[in-house]
Amino acid sequence: MFDTVCTLPLSADLFSQALHPKEPIVSVGLSTGHVQTFRLPSEESDTDNDGAESTSSSRNGKGHIDTMWRTRRHKGSCRCLGFGVDGEMLYSAGTDGLVKAAKAETGVVENKIAIPPAKDGSVDAPTIVHALSPQTLLLATDSSALHLYDLRIPFSPVSARPQQTHHPHDDYISSLTPLPPSDTSTSGFSKQWVTTGGTTLAVTDLRRGVLVRSEDQEEELVSSVYIGGLRAGGTSRGEKVIVGGSSGVLTLWEKGAWDDQDERIYVQREAGGGESLETLAVVPDELGKGKMIAVGLGSGGVKFVRMGVNKVVSEVMHDETEGVIGLGFDVEGRMVSGGGQIVKVWHEAVDSDEMDGDTIGGKRMFGSGSDSDDSDDGDDSDDSDRGSRKAAQPQRKKRKNKGKGGQDIMGFADID
């Protein structure tokens, strides 16, 4: 399925990762408060003059991954990132108590939101930022708050207050997954979403608030993703939310039946409990491998679970010591995994007769673009803040498995 990987070294621990919805762009948020945005080579541009596709530069080892921009965005760590639905804006949230909206292409800040403080007046650090639509931004925090902001309200020097605040869980929100819009939707944007927090799952509606909270699952729920197009039958409509737990088990939840899980898949069994399933992503249907989920583990591996048979069919290793924090697929079907101080870009397998001489141990890699930390400009402050800066102190992150990761080159075998 994939057999090539490019490794991008980072200057600090990765705390957040986001993939552009329309272009081959990946952004990372670091423990130092830096945000850096990379552009991956586009295979669409690699065509002959007569329109026939040539061997992609991203496959033959001659492509470049370029740093579009890099800046010190937050005084503390950058805990979360998310692109707007059209990819024009990049939202970041940090332990400095700020959410910043910047142009994805340039990194220039256009808006700021002050996160409401905790009850004791301290910073209520963010856990998730998600643009639900062009009008609505969702922000979750350590105190279990879920704030909803109307992005149509013009920027004001006065700190914007959320239009709504909910508390769907007793603990901080660990994941947020939007549900697809209904058939009667006129906007085409989601108005409901699933969250996990502590040992429960909840569904919240844009207008009606928290609709339902599940029974106590007696296990910490860590990650979630929606998948449709599964085989329908009986009471199943072929739509499920997949939830990753802290003990190595995936639970399957039928859409609309949120009281309790209906199936379990053991991904990582170990004596005394499995490994935490930190992040989930749906493998694109275009890759032709059927319905499949990629699971990023706290142990540094990525496992692939085929739906239907509900079992692990393959595994690759992102890093042998650091957990997988970010996982997703870009617009061209490449898997991007992040954790520790590295980001890896995995490519779909290429037939052996397409391979050229530019290989390393049978695996090709990109040439390095302008992504060296040495190329960082002298002004390391936020684009919108030109005043003096104090040195940022990285703050403790909720997730485990932080630290320096290896920077080796790895490949993996086909998934059939």
Swiss-Prot record:
Disulphide-bridged cysteine pairs: none
Subcellular location: Nucleus, Nucleolus
Main location class: nucleus
Record key words, sorted: Nucleus, Repeat, WD repeat
GO cellular component labels: nucleolus
WD repeats: 9-48, 73-112, 118-159, 222-263, 319-356
Record InterPro entries: WD40/YVTN_repeat-like_dom_sf (IPR015943), WD40_repeat_dom_sf (IPR036322), WDR55_POC1 (IPR050505)
Chain intervals for the UniProt region annotation (Disordered): 39-64, 353-416
Protein family (similarity comment): Belongs to the WD repeat WDR55 family.
This protein's name: WD repeat-containing protein jip5
